[in-house]
Amino acid sequence: MRVNIVCSKWGTRYGPHFVNRLKNMARRNCNDRHDFHFYCYTDDADGLDPDIKVIPFPDIPDIHPKYWFGTDNFKYGMARCWDRPKTMVFNTHNFADDKPTGRFVFFDLDVIIQNDIEPLLTYNMERPTKLRSWWQDPRPMKTRKFKLAHGAYTNGSCQVWSDDQAECIWHDVLENQEKIWFTYTDGTDNYHSWRWGDWGKKLWDHFPADYAYSYNRGRSWDDDDLETEIYRETPILCVFNIDLLPEQMLKGRGSVKQNELVDPELLKHWQ
């Protein structure tokens, strides 16, 4: 099976070593029987390893970072739907020069791959599948405030699909981007949760709670496994979501960024 790992990098928050280490982790944890390829969408390819297939961000108004990154179109200091360039990855089978087919796995740069990714590749071959924030308290999700704010219950740190299964997302963005940026202001996780999730077109399936954990949130609310800033050996992925705004920061949540990590067990993987 052809396996296409995809990521995206823009601006200066993440250096090239984040991309290179992600590639190394993905390759180490992908079975040798697969045909492995690694792609990176970026506005600056300096420092990337030579075996990474670079895709310059297509020059599409209001989606390419140059049209909004650092402009005045911000909310609380962040661009409306600040990670919008990540929507391009769902059209990688057309944007990449080699027109890849097979399984596509998108990873955020602030992910650590701890174990074999085979379960991610084979969990559901019939539907696109992504992480869900199982560590999140489900009670606020039932409130009117959560629905009016289009709150997010999915986590885009890992998203998997086959061939053109997710191309419909890219077409939706092209056709409705102004509405999307101003409706789902806090990011693409909000967009996916409502437009394509349980309250939308039900495109996405979700990986089980034991596939990933958040270093700053825990693993599962239902399993009462919410201790933060600890290494969990068995999950496939560790993600590093943090609160971006002071009013979001809640007691009991960690705030460790990946480049501040000192945990020796996790650092063994992140290289």
Question: Model segments located where?
Answer:
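A short, glycine-/small-residue-rich helix N-cap motif at loop->alpha-helix starts
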Residues: 61-65, 78-85
